[in-house]
Amino acid sequence: MFPNNKMLLIAGPCVIEDNSVFETARRLKEIVAPYSSSVHWIFKSSYDKANRSSLQNYRGPGLKLGLQTLAKIKETFDVEILTDVHSPDEAREAAKVCDIIQVPAFLCRQTDLLVTAGETQAIVNIKKGQFLSPWEMQGPIDKVLSTGNNKIILTERGCSFGYNNLVSDMRSIEVLRRFGFPVIFDGTHSIQLPGALQSQSGGQTEFIPVLTRSAIAAGVHGLFIETHPNPASALSDAASMLSLKDLERLLPSWVQLFTYIQEMDTVSI
């Protein structure tokens, strides 16, 4: 599906807010350009955040306008596109535009959604639910494989640890790798504090550098990073997104570590 020697970087804003998404895509392409031989960039953004903490929170432009926007970004910047879907009907529509359709963590056991996603023959990124052990991902994988589609990505995004907290168990990455599909670490959702701000989730972005480096050292094939020009003003996940400026600062260390790990001799016990 992807070059074996390149780090996957799935990056973009949490949700399409307005036409500023085009400037974000332009900046991302500019940031990644110096590392084109080492990084395979995929643009991500959502047309609808269906699981916002509060009914009053911004959800996005909706399916029709959102997919039109993603199609324009794909054409303008010559980049592959990922977006998340929430129903079988959405999966069918999104697959007409997007290269990768994502099954959200909260929906990762929904049989109809997984089967329909597989039937589109698009690449399917299954995010591991915060409530699942890594070995339980066999079930969601089998549902997609039942359609004859083996183009699967698995994403680790932390697991629930008491109320309003997530932890990242790096053993999970090794377990997921053994399924034989590319494994991605979500460096921004993994530092969320779900519901900690009551009407929205909090976040501890100061832990993004150490967790992303740890995940790369553990053997992930790439990173999932939600990024924004000014996270404080973002309409969704303001507390957990990484600024474009900080992404640009962190990218060299990610690439350097990924290259080093790729060149190491792996020792199994």
Curated annotation (Swiss-Prot):
* Reactions accelerated catalytically: D-arabinose 5-phosphate + phosphoenolpyruvate + H2O = 3-deoxy-alpha-D-manno-2-octulosonate-8-phosphate + phosphate
GO BP field = keto-3-deoxy-D-manno-octulosonic acid biosynthetic process
Which Gene Ontology terms cover its molecular function? 3-deoxy-8-phosphooctulonate synthase activity
- Listed transmembrane segments: none
Q: Which SUPFAM superfamilies match?
A: Aldolase
> Any one cellular component term from GO for this entry?
cytoplasm
Query: What are the EC numbers?
Result: 2.5.1.55
Pathway where this protein functions: Carbohydrate biosynthesis; 3-deoxy-D-manno-octulosonate biosynthesis; 3-deoxy-D-manno-octulosonate from D-ribulose 5-phosphate: step 2/3; Bacterial outer membrane biogenesis; lipopolysaccharide biosynthesis
Say if the entry is tagged with keyword Repressor: no
Localization: Cytoplasm
Xref: InterPro entries: Aldolase_TIM, DAHP1/KDSA, KDO8P_synthase
NCBIfam families in alphabetical order = KDO8P_synth (TIGR01362), PRK05198.1 (NF003543)
Q: Which family does it belong to?
A: Belongs to the KdsA family.
Q: Which HAMAP family match?
A: KDO8P_synth
Please state what the protein is called: 2-dehydro-3-deoxyphosphooctonate aldolase
- In the record, what lineage is assigned to the organism producing the protein? Bacteria, Pseudomonadati, Chlamydiota, Chlamydiia, Chlamydiales
What gene makes this protein? Answer: kdsA
